[in-house]
Each structure stands twice: as C-alpha cells, then as structure tokens.
C-alpha cells in the first residue's frame, strides 16, 4: 500500500516552487510528468493528495451522507450486510481479504465478486457472543483476486449461492497493515466507543457529565451509536451541541429486524463498526457505557500515562479492566461527584476493555475475543493501576472510591453547570 514518504514531501515542495516560478515567469512548455521512488506517476499536487487519501481513511473527508449511519443492506429476508472493509493485515485471518459484516439467521454458502471477478476463497467467521439467537453476526471473508489493488476496490457483491440473490456492499473502511503504522499517523490518542444510547436509559445531564469528565481525562473523541427517533428534545439538543463542537460523533443505528431476535440489542454490530472506525485513527480506544468511567488509580499519572504504561509491551493488543460498582444512591448528575461509596469486591468477570484497534479482529462487549496476530496478547488488569467505576442503583458498601471527585471535581462542576445552564437542561 502506498505511503506518505519523505520523497513525496520533497516532491510536493518542489512542485509548489515550480508553480510559483511558472506563475511569475511564464514559459512556453511545462514539464509533463513527475515520478516518485516507486515509479508512480504524478502530474500535479492533486494526484499526490488523492494518493494520500487512499492510504489513510479519513471519515470526515468522505462526501457520503451515510457516513454517520450504520447502513444495513438487505440481501434477502434472512441476511443483511454492512460495514465492508479491505483488510491489509497479514495475520491469522488470512491475507489479503475484503471482509463484510453480516447478520444472518442461519449459516449458508455465499460467494463474492470483487471488481467483476469471483473470489476463490470465501468463508464465514462467527462471532463468539451470538448466544444462539435468531439473528447472528458473522464476518464474510472474501479473498482478493490476484491483480486487483485494494485501493481500486469500492464495493463487493455478496451472493447467496443457493438462490443467486445478491447485494452490492460499498467499502466503508480501509484497514492498514498494523505493523507499519507510525505514532504520528494517529489523529487521536484516546477515544471512546459507546455501543448504544437507548432512548430512556439516561437523561441529558448524564450525557453532559460523561462528555465533560472524559474530556477532562484527555479523551479526544467519543463515538455514540443511537436511534435519534427514540430521543427526547433535551437529549437531541445536548447531543447536537457536542456534535457541533466536535467532541462527539453521532452514528445513527437502527436494526432492520426486531431487537428481541438478537443478543443484547445487536451491540456486536456497533462495537465492531466502532472498532473499525478507530483502526489506524486512534491509538487507544475504550469501550464503555454512559454509567462507566475508566479511572487511573495513581494520583500523579494521567489516564494516557497510565494506559501507555499498561501497553508498554508492544505485543499487547487489549487490556481487560476490572471494575468497582458504585452505589448510585443520589440519582442526579453529576453522579461521580455525589456517589463515592463502592462495594469492596473488584469485579473481574464483566470487565470493560481498552484496545489498540489495529491489533484486534473481534471485540466483544466485555472482552476481546480475537487478536489479528498469534503473538498479540489480550491481558487482564486487576484494578491496581486502572479500574472502571460503574454506577448502579444498588446498595454497595463500604469503600470510598472518590478518585474522580478528588482529581476533577472542581473543574467538572464548573463545566457541568456551564453547559447545563447554556442548554437550559
């Protein structure tokens, strides 16, 4: 896959200089073509910029109105496809493949066509958290035919072998070879994926607390999957405010079938889409809900410093983080300032994860199910350096868990009151 190299930067500077000279000193003829170190032909700066955009998938540069919508494409009554991606990682799931996320009611044989040519190797990969529900999630793996470049693939045709019914699925993401990603290529250091915002699950003030507190902790982007039709006016106003201020990205998410036919409201779809959305874009991505906060334990270390230490081993792709249940006795925001009593027990089963997205192939709700290389590791952290505060309406006793309040209390109160007043919540 082409990359942004020093020679391309030098070429860009040289072209800019030439354009300036030509503008001030017109000449009869111009040099027709330039070449980079790979022999790629460039006629102007625009072609270089086009090449750069092929290398890194930048969502905000895609002129597609559906980019912030999880688009389910119907193959037939028993199959929906979405979020197709090219996968340039040479790992334990094969190389090179175009992959398609699918909800299906039963396993069947499928074929794929890429740029008019049939894929010679097609297989289904089942997610580990389907729990024998009617609708189950799979990844359809389609081997890239020889002679086709990933960057020239814009869609894949998925065909049910028995009926010949098909659907064309646009490529949504381009996943780079994770071994050649450099630190300066990430847009964000830390982001959060919120798999689902249910219409009556939280009020607008809880959202304000969640966004402001995580911003204070250094989170640069929060991705929220929600069905806008289920939200009340205050919630819509609050989400729009933060979306307009670029602190959150809203992704519209509406299942194409009944929720009771799929495990846990179909959150595997949003978790996986958000994993792909952050791959190559964010260094560390957290998966948690609005009533959960990742908390660094050591006072002198920030969240980013704590996470960086936990991922010091470059083969670690995921950290399963233990949590403490906090008694949400006072049911008004900011919860983190008013509720500080937890149970003594550390919860190590229903963990939450922070991951290096490019190293993960399958992410679950509470654990990482598969990494992309056999030598990559998913490890568990018992809460000594990092833990999750989970606020629940239960009587927990009797430990003090006021780390968030002590560290960010004054700033959070100021920012919370400011936004609540501004939006008249």
Curated annotation (Swiss-Prot):
Extract one GO cellular component term from the record.
intracellular organelle
Q: Where are the glycosylation sites?
A: 109, 152
Q: How does it sit in the membrane?
A: Single-pass type II membrane protein
Q: Which residues lie on this side of the membrane: Lumenal?
A: 30-425
Q: Share an example GO biological-process annotation for this protein.
A: protein galactosylation
**What kind of modification does the protein receive after translation?**
N-glycosylated.
**Which of UniProt's keywords are assigned here?**
Glycoprotein, Glycosyltransferase, Golgi apparatus, Manganese, Membrane, Metal-binding, Signal-anchor, Transferase, Transmembrane, Transmembrane helix
Q: Does the keyword Hydrolase apply?
A: no
The residues covered by the GT92 domain are 189-394
- Write down what this protein is called: Beta-1,4-galactosyltransferase galt-1
């Amino acid at each position: 896959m082409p990359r942004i190299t020093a020679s391309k930067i030098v070429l860009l500077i040289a072209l800019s200089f030439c354009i300036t000279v030509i503008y001030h000193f017109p000449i009869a003829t111009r040099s027709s073509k330039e070449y980079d170190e790979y022999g790629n032909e460039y006629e102007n700066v625009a072609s270089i910029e086009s090449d750069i955009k092929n290398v890194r998938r930048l969502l905000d540069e895609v002129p597609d109105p559906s980019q912030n919508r999880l688009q389910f494409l119907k193959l037939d009554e028993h199959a929906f496809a979405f979020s197709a991606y090219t996968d340039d990682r040479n790992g334990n799931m094969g190389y090179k493949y175009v992959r398609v996320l699918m909800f299906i009611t039963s396993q069947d044989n499928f074929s794929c066509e890429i740029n008019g040519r049939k894929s010679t190797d097609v297989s289904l990969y089942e997610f580990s958290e389907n729990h024998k529900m009617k609708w189950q999630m799979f990844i359809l793996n389609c081997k890239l035919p020889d002679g086709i470049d990933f960057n020239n693939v814009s869609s894949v045709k998925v065909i049910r072998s028995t009926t010949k019914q098909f659907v064309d699925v646009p490529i949504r993401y381009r996943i780079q070879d994770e071994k050649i990603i450099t630190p300066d290529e990430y847009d964000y250091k830390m982001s959060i994926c919120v798999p689902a915002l249910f219409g009556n699950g939280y009020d607008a003030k809880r959202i304000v607390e969640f966004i402001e507190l995580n911003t204070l902790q250094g989170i640069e982007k929060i991705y929220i999957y929600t069905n806008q039709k289920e939200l009340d006016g205050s919630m819509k106003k609050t989400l729009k405010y933060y979306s307009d201020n670029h602190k959150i990205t809203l992704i519209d998410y509406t299942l194409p079938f009944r929720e009771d036919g799929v495990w846990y409201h179909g959150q595997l779809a949003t978790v996986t889409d958000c994993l792909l959305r952050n791959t190559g874009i964010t260094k560390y991505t957290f998966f948690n809900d609005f009533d959960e906060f990742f908390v660094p334990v050591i006072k002198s270390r920030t969240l980013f410093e704590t996470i960086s230490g936990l991922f010091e081993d470059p083969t670690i792709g995921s950290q399963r983080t233990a949590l403490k249940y906090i008694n949400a006795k006072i049911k008004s925001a900011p919860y983190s300032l008013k509720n500080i009593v937890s149970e003594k027990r550390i919860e190590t089963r229903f963990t939450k994860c922070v991951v290096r997205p490019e190293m993960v192939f399958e992410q679950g709700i509470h654990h990482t199910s598969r990494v992309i290389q056999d030598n990559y590791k998913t490890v568990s952290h018992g809460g000594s350096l990092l833990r999750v505060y989970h606020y629940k309406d239960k009587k927990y006793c009797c430990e003090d868990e006021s780390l968030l309040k002590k560290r960010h209390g004054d700033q959070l109160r100021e920012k919370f009151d400011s936004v609540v007043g501004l939006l008249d919540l």
